């Protein structure tokens, strides 16, 4: 692996094949092999050290026998000595060998570790901010201590490696203005197979207005030029996971409690639930003035349940009327020893436990002498909730300068414990983590510091700070709303050194802090770049090209680019960034994996020029993405209108259409892969796919082989988007690709509405369409849209939308879909209007109101009056099928509907929009709503509003099979048998429907009135699209086989086009257009090819002399002009077949052109003359079907739960716990397991035991314990529950004493719970050595029920001790592998 040049120097690495190549083909970029010195040459043995003592020996004469005996004796001695010598030598050899092996194992270098290269020389440059270091050929340096230098350039085989220790005890900080890695240079901190163990920090320092700026790279950077190597590999950590249990505000289920008041005379008392820390009662007893108050306190304490926590604090004075009986009650029930001697205005505080004795009581007293008396009587005790959270209760009473104060606090102590989905044993005390918002505002994301936690499992951590907001850790209503939790700390840190506040020309009008951080920039033809488990903090600058990680015009960086080891970034933590997270600029084939981008300015994961392809983003988390200044799409409202130096003239940008698009994932080309990512909070969008008409920026002028608009979508699988303001997922629009000019004064790269996504095979519009697949999207708590999707063929499947302003909107185009024949479909999906995630006020959540289902307070999207919709119909054609809707209930403030329509819609909606196999839950009051005049809907008079319609194929929406649903006041689609649904503002009709596309020339501000002959009193007035343009257009939906007349509010158009839209062969309508009586006509027919604008098969219409003749010849090209009424009649009848979802026929769009010649400028409204002459009695063309009865078979999604870990199985469990009145009414108590109901109607306890290792589920035991025999449950819980079991318990009726608290501790509770005199008790537990996060206890006061509770229990976890099943299929990993192969 190493080669020596002619001068005897050894370069650190051999060059790769790509770039400036000097490496042989066997080189693997990034692998580090230390250079071993050659063994010493073998030399001739030096002189043998023979030390033979020459001794004079005496000679003796022996007889032959004696000589023989002596020889035998000597021989035996020699054998014995030889054996002894051999044994000693062998023993010494093995001892020496063991020592050598021990030493070598301890000191031999690991060839995978760059810092163990024996050719490295220790380097300690010291602290010299003026030193400009150049590491060149022959320089192989190991940094061993802190250093400050001006700059470092590594070139021509130079190598810089950070020293490390096996025990990770080194802590090295290198401060420098920049590090430039040039051809042949390399910087290593750890390696993939030998991760860095110590702490390494590179601090990039310098101010924007000081010092020189380097060409290309600028200031404060790590730059990699062609031939350079950058390998940074920190210790592995679980990058991010999800909460497995809800993290409550203040760390307690009902929050913390703080109270303080002056002169609150008497004894102030709080009763606290010992299991939940909830304040149960708050009372004041004026025992100073009134003896009755003393008696009331005595009775109050008498009826408290044993075990309750009681806190008491004196306000002002409490002793004067305090009766002895009350004193004794306090002594007996709370164990007080100081109450007996309580005197005038003495400050006294107590925290005790009812019937807990003196050992449970903590109290304090301070004497009062005069107004100058001071001192605080403070009592405090610590407790645990049943979930194991430690909390304290504090009571205090004091005098301060003559003012009496008393107060209470209930708060967590010693940190808050978090339960997490994955093993986080790699997270250590002192690490920083972030927990994402699970509400509408991304600003509810919170940072925490980890504390030591000896009692925590591998799935738990303890945090120092107290949570301010609620963070969900549950699957709610079948939707995974568990908050993401990311680790920000890494042991390799690259950070920008920043000033205390903004300065110089750093956009200080928008930011009050320094935004001039460091940056990493990688150029084309680098040798090797791999970054893993590195923390980047205060990186990026509000300047173009200066980002935390920036792959700049690198081309192909995988195998296609000649890299045997494809380039990746893995496990990075990029936080508090000043410009983006990772920029992929003119770069293809990059893998971005397990990376966190938190608190950034501008688009976070950013694909820049619209040419970036084949990049894979796998399991990344982005949150708190804020506006920046670089591009118009980064900017917010104020930035957009203030930054006008690049617009033309005096143009003022329009924020909503030019800017305001900042996104966590900005995907500028569809041929990229997104798998398992989370966009958990952006000012505008979570994931935004946009489509460049041509390459932009530094890629401008490059010729793309395929247009992004036409390119099939890469892999989109299992991504989640929430807490975004504009949209979770947005597929639409592009950017302006021309400079500002008088013709278009908008800024270059501002948001543009010209692009239309229409994917085709090989990006060739002449080849078949390729449907873009959005598979497994979870979108919740997005203020506006969960997803807005515009394009050609797009399929959304296996997805869930909850608590969004609008769940999902499909859009195509205003008149005709750009991609002829395309359609959009959503299937196997779930829509939830108002879930049990009620949210939490604060963190810029602006709106709070009352929920429609249970009237509980909840945070709201957009506005308190905003109409919530699950699926929004727009344009078309769309198909909604096999989907379920839950919890859409209006309130007095707002409408809420499962299905709705785009409000204030001026464009077309096709009657080919269709719905089938949908299911509506019991809490859906409005299946459909067409809007009504009022807030948000305004006057509901736009053309699209009036023509809203869809086809209910199977009756699953309306109960009428093969029916169409339109707005109630639309008489173009009605017949006498139609059914009105007033609360929907809808009408349900049978029939066949199509559209007429009417276009006129040179008729600005002209409104069209269309009237059906059967309903002349109910015309429809259409304002037209683009009223001020030269070619306004109108597109009403019409019932086929009917007659219509068309009128105008101004002079009749001289040129009018009528297009038959969505007509099948032989479909027809008759139209009569109003003209002055002296008008002459030229009417022609032709097929228009919309792709190229050509016209074919042109035919002339000929006049006939009567309407009767026209009716007889309706299949011919004829027209009839009735000059008495001014109506030009003709039949619009389709001659050709229409295929699939095409708006037009297979021959082209059938079009009639009317050229009118008249000198009249009168208003052309013929209504008064046309009717009643042409009135027809309303009739039914297609019989109205009978209303369906019974349940819709096979309707709704087959999936019960939608999670971000779809490879796991979850068991849905639902409890129905009625209250006393409901019980007396006969309502059952129910435990439902995976849809199977277990019902009981008699007072007692139902207990189910479920096998946690079986899917879907296996019930192993069902036992009912009647009230009369309820004590048997104690023995059953002791001996009857088998190991490795899920335990589900529910009570019915009031059971005064259920002595099983201590028996629930082994099943998951942290301590015995208070179960006396409860209305209902519900418990989920686990019998085994593992304590899952889902074990829970719910109780309600006497007479009250718990309503409906739903839990989703994971099955087949290794921690349960389940037998190893076959390998779980991981679709995400299969797709990742597929994406890598596609590279």
Curated annotation (Swiss-Prot):
Recorded coiled-coil stretches: none
Extracellular compartment spans: 104-1383
GO molecular function terms listed in the Swiss-Prot or TrEMBL record: cadherin binding; calcium ion binding; carbohydrate binding; hyalurononglucosaminidase activity
Cellular component per GO, a single term: extracellular exosome
Ranges facing Cytoplasmic side: 1-82
The keyword Transmembrane is assigned to this record: yes
Keyword Coiled coil attached: no
Start and stop residues of the PbH1 repeats: 669-691, 711-733, 791-812
Region of interest called Disordered, as start-end residue ranges on this chain: 1-50
GO BP terms: angiogenesis; hyaluronan catabolic process; regulation of sprouting angiogenesis
Induction / repression: Up-regulated in by proinflammatory cytokines in normal human dermal fibroblasts (NHDF).
E.C. numbers: 3.2.1.35
Tissue and organ distribution: Widely expressed.
Family according to the record: Belongs to the CEMIP family.
PANTHER family with a match to the protein in the record: CELL SURFACE HYALURONIDASE, TRANSMEMBRANE PROTEIN 2-RELATED
Function: Cell surface hyaluronidase that mediates the initial cleavage of extracellular high-molecular-weight hyaluronan into intermediate-size hyaluronan of approximately 10-5 kDa fragments. Very specific to hyaluronan; not able to cleave chondroitin sulfate or dermatan sulfate. Has an essential function in systemic hyaluronan catabolism and turnover and regulates cell adhesion and migration via hyaluronan degradation at focal adhesion sites. Acts as a regulator of angiogenesis and heart morphogenesis by mediating degradation of extracellular hyaluronan, thereby regulating VEGF signaling.
Protein name in UniProt: Cell surface hyaluronidase CEMIP2
Organism: Homo sapiens (Human)
